[in-house]
Amino acid sequence: MSQARTLHRLIAPAVEALGFELVGCELFRRGATTILQVFVDKPGGIGLDECAKVSRQISAVLDVEDPIRGRYTLEVSSPGLERPLYTANHYRRFIGNKAKIRLREPREGQRQFRGMVVAVDNEEQVTLQLDNKILKVSLGEIEKANLIADFEG
């Protein structure tokens, strides 16, 4: 299990106890600094004060459990307009929206695709309508995915 998944399982109860959805978390390095980026949401969106409240709660859990080796920076935010997509339910929620995905392994010589999310089946297979074809991929094949903000309406 990846460290991000372990952290997700560790902090999810604290986030949910405050009435928020833990959309996902990512652990990465930016220069010499380790960053734990946590995305939270609720119906109607989440504000800065609420992010601060969640941050304090997550910090308390992480201080007790100490799952990250060394120093790190905790960033808590809304998922934003180009929100990450992690689960089948995320894709289902945004059927009809444009997304960009990066696959773990190339398919037909390509790892990155942009298209409209058109379906998610019970086997967690995501279907995207690309410009000229349909792409079906399992969640396990997807390394990273985000919505594409549509400012044209």
From Swiss-Prot:
Protein family membership: Belongs to the RimP family.
KW Cytoplasm (keyword) present: yes
Keywords associated with the record: Cytoplasm, Ribosome biogenesis
Location within or outside the cell: Cytoplasm
Pfam family, one: DUF150_C
Organism the protein comes from: Coxiella burnetii (strain RSA 493 / Nine Mile phase I)
Xref: HAMAP family: RimP
Listed GO CC annotations: cytosol
SUPFAM superfamilies attached to this UniProt entry: YhbC-like, C-terminal domain, YhbC-like, N-terminal domain
Tagged with keyword Nucleus: no
InterPro entries, A to Z: Ribosome_maturation_RimP, RimP_C, RimP_C_sf, RimP_N, RimP_N_sf
Regions annotated as coiled coil: none
Gene3D superfamilies: Ribosome maturation factor RimP, C-terminal domain, RimP-like superfamily, N-terminal
Reported function: Required for maturation of 30S ribosomal subunits.
Protein name according to UniProt: Ribosome maturation factor RimP
GO BP annotations, alphabetical order: ribosomal small subunit assembly; translation
Gene coding for it: rimP
